[in-house]
Amino acid sequence: MKIVDLLGGQAEYYLNHTCKTIDKQLIHIPGPDMIDKVWMNSDRNIRTLESLQALYGHGRLANTGYVSILPVDQGIEHSAGASFAPNPLYFDPENIIKLAIEGGCNAVASTFGVLGAVARKYAHKIPFIVKLNHNELLTYPNSYDQVMFGTVKEAWNMGAVAVGATIYFGSEQSRRQIVEVSQAFEYAHELGMATILWCYLRNSSFKKDETDYHAAADLTG
């Protein structure tokens, strides 16, 4: 089925939309030269550039400048039972990796447990991104805190090309999270790994009356 058919009546809007707010000359448009155009002149070392190229150069979107990553942190951030009950085969970590490969993803991002269980068999077949920290949901009341579940060296030893981490900006523990993640990413770069930061706002004060300012442009931009 063609994309036009999938989009139906919205095809014209999505496929032919032209942004009038920001001229495209002011942004770095994704393309085959993404590494050379955006990253080559940065302070990233050669090994890290190599890892970035491994991400950008894999899967169906290889060397287009676009990246498709399968993220699965069920079992820690989310209930595996609630997520996988309709498809129990995904309780097996290997099937998560197979899904990413069959889907033509650039990489698969998951936990130490999921990726570590199949690293020897699959780390050379699809780029691994190991998520370093997680919010565990068994503590009550939930504190919106990201806790380190492993080390950068563990991720490197299992053959991962990148590590990722989350920071809950605005939360009570955000300053500690910023320090922990920045130190972890510094070491990851020393080892030649790419890094990915997932950013979320978490503060009850951002909600006032009936308005939720977590999505406000000046907070998310």
What is each PLM-predicted segment?
Residues 1-78, 83, 116-125:
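N-terminal amphipathic alpha-helix/helix-capping segment at the start of soluble metabolic enzymes
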Residues 23-29, 62, 67, 74-221:
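Alpha/beta enzyme core
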